[in-house]
Amino acid sequence: RLVCCQAARANPLYLAYQKARAEDRDLREEDFRPIEAGDTLASAIRIGHPVSLPKAIRALVATRGVVEQATEQELADAVARADRTGMFNCPHTGVTLACFEKLVQRGEIRKDERVVVISTAHGLKFTEFKARYHAGTLDGIDSPLANQPVEMGSEPDEVASAIHRVLDARI
């Protein structure tokens, strides 16, 4: 089953899917209305009128697919949660992870099902986004999962000392 994930500020397919769902029927091209996509942390998927719309709708219908959206807060927190596991993801993958979490919580994805999340960019391309999340300076975003940055010098002794200070403060 295919799942389409969109940022809430750039969600025309999600809106079309919700319209079809409210009428208890499959998604159709005539459900779609282009939108002017708003600013989103997931800038590469800021698309209000996808050129591949007919293919996307055919794929969703053929696979009994669903469409979900993620808010800016949800995508930012999903990225921070993933970072804590060693996955260093981009905001676009954060949209997918946030939507995945929502679908699991609603039971649309069962715990015994296998899921593949395709990440097309690396977090290193989005270091400013990550640093601002953890510093609590992203506009309109709370940072409940922030891992506060620690300033330190570049000498090994300074790095070791900074690590000890952080660890000692946690004990």
Residue ranges and their predicted role:
Residues R1-A7, V116-T120:
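Extended hydrophobic secondary-structure segments that form protein cores and membrane-embedded regions
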Residues V3-P91, Y133-I171:
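Active-site/ligand-binding loops adjacent to catalytic centers
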Residues E72-E128:
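Claisen-condensing/thiolase-fold acyl-transfer catalytic domains that form or cleave C-C bonds
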